Amino acid sequence: MALNIYHEARGEPVVGQVAVAQSVLNRIADNRYPNTVCGVVKQAKYNPWDSVTPIRNQCQYSWFCDGKSDTPKDDKAMLEATIVAQFVLSGSSRDVTEGATHYHADYVYPYWADSLIPTIKIGSHIYYR
């Protein structure tokens, strides 16, 4: 969870980082998605002959299969993401996304956005359910 927060919401206000984490929990609660944090974050398309390496740019979270290193380079931001992850996973936060399972940066408009209901904009992300 912390690594996903780091890559998806680094530089966002804390509430934006909480929102990214909450959207993962919302997916876990939805039977259309895997039922674990790792399952949701690592959900991707794989070649039939390689079940280990996801197909590039075919992941739910782009950082997971963009071909770049996933190792955090900003220790302070990773610490903050870890604290946010612990807070959300402990059940201490409320769902600020209003049930969102999807989000995107406000400077793009993905093909799936028209098929979902927008719920809220937090930081530079727009959330949908």
Segment roles from a protein language model:
Residues 1-129:
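Bacterial extracytoplasmic/cell-wall-associated proteins, especially those involved in peptidoglycan
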